[in-house]
Amino acid sequence: MKSKSIMAASTVMELALAQASADPLCSTIINLQPIEYQFQQPVLIDSYFPANTDIVLDDGHVVHVTNAPTSLSTVLTDVSTSSTTLTSSASNGNGNPPDGGYLTFTVPANPDDIGNHPVTKTYPPTEPGQPGIVVIQVPTSPPGADGIPTSSVPYVTVTTTGDFPSLTGPVTTTVTPGEPGATGSVIIEVPNTKITSPSASYVTVTTPGSVAPTDAPRTSTIPPSNPTDPGTVIVVVPSSQASSVSSIPFVTVTTTGSTLNPTDDPITSTISPSGSTGSGTVIVEVPPSSSPSGSGASSSPVSVVTRTVTGDDGNGEPSTTTITPTASSGPGTVIVEVPPPTNSPSATSPGSSRPGGPGSSGTGSSASQGPSDSAALSSSTGDAGPSSSVPETSSPSRATTDDAASSTSASAPASSSAASSITQSETPSSAGAETSTPATSPASSSAPSTSDADTSSPVNPTTSSPASSAATSAPGSSTESAPSSSTSSAAANFDPCPDSLYGNPQCCSVDVLGVADVECDSPTESPTDADNFQAICAASGQRARCCVLPVLGQALVCLTPVGVSN
């Protein structure tokens, strides 16, 4: 609603009345000096603005609306000035204005209020002898900067975007029409407000799968479920190369793909580790709209704990579940559910399904090759008569299937493998038996054969062969095998906490509730394997943990190492 008020000073009215009655002989109309009036027009703005814009008022003033999207509810006072001419009627000769004398005021008015025709309002005298007042409202629009009434000029608002940081705020340019009746333009240039996602973070998860040993690792990328969660890069490596899920570290490098469109999915490529102890590299090419701030590529800085579980949701593909941190400084959790690894074609020993010769204690068997697993083979005998089979033993060292197959595939009486002849001198035998043992743990023992049989017993760190569980040792047979060099090397290179974030091995005490880890100390000696790590900490009444190096003012955050059950 719009309204206007005329503010006329009372002294001006008194001056006009005095001049109208001062000279009784004067009968002409008195034209006074033009009087300037001030118009106050309230302008109500009550609306929601989804984007920054400008509001052009009738008098040419522009109201800038910023910080959009926003709701604005306010009343502005549009102040304008105008001048008019005051006229008075003649005197009747007796010192008083004649009856029906009037003072006439001609004032401008907004056509939106009165229309396109003048409007006359008459106010009769309040007392006898006093003149009345006639107000003539003439429809007149306030002129703009070039003299053209702004109310008759239509404007078209055009909003464009400019580059940041050269444009830090809205810039308004008003183009007035060159002639009456033309359309003006209001050009509003705003900075590019497209929201750029934060640095794309990706968590790398390494898992064994059905990949041939000669093939490169297979990678798949799972985009983040929401902008604040990290994405996941799953690296599937051959089963024969994965001693554990976390033993092959991969470093994720995020870079901007110059050939990608903003709507394209990230592209991942994998560079395998250069050595057995080196780190691999996963390169994630992301679209320009989601590239990290700054130049170049950066390693993923996100603090996330990754837990891998085995499961299958039916589609045979890995799936992730992200749990956001409960505190601003705490790590988040990404649970990766991977399908169980399938049997690799190279994990079955040739000839393992062949039955043994006369006197054999069992048939050959094959074992699936999981992380750090080798194929288990049953023992076969020669022609020297009955012999006893030797139970298989486990060792953390890795035995290749090809070597094991070469030492056990021959079941003929006169055949013997090169491996059995090499290790014949390492193990005593009461009957001249030739025994091939690629690697055994220090705590395991194998019985010497009481016959002339050629026996091969490759190791299997985590999975027992069905044939080995069914075999029985001969009465009174016992041997002791010396620790192999590969076992000692594996123990010396054992890393209880291979994770780059949780890489600090600690022995921690449990709190009164039996949940949190408190008062952590370094192990008194270097662990040789997961069981040894657990035993070292258990000797002091503590639990084996892999912790994040604490920062000043931050609580200790730990995880249970792989293979530790406490």
Swiss-Prot record:
Highest taxon, organism lineage: Eukaryota
Disulfide feature: C497-C546, C507-C537, C508-C520, C547-C558
Transmembrane segments: none
Subcellular location: Secreted; Secreted, Cell wall
GO CC annotations on file: extracellular region
Protein keywords: Cell wall, Disulfide bond, Secreted, Signal, Virulence
Induction: Expression occurs in the early stages of infection and is directly regulated by the transcription factor FTF2.
Chief location: secreted
InterPro entries: Cerato-ulmin_hydrophobin (IPR010636), Hydrophobin_sf (IPR036686)
First and last residue of the signal peptide: 1-22
Pfam families: Hydrophobin_2 (PF06766)
Family from the record: Belongs to the cerato-ulmin hydrophobin family.
Oligomeric form and interacting partners: Homodimer. Homodimers further self-assemble to form highly ordered films at water-air interfaces through intermolecular interactions.
Function: Aerial growth, conidiation, and dispersal of filamentous fungi in the environment rely upon a capability of their secreting small amphipathic proteins called hydrophobins (HPBs) with low sequence identity. Class I can self-assemble into an outermost layer of rodlet bundles on aerial cell surfaces, conferring cellular hydrophobicity that supports fungal growth, development and dispersal; whereas Class II form highly ordered films at water-air interfaces through intermolecular interactions but contribute nothing to the rodlet structure.
Name of the featured protein: Class II hydrophobin FOXG_02748
Organism: Fusarium oxysporum f. sp. lycopersici (strain 4287 / CBS 123668 / FGSC 9935 / NRRL 34936)
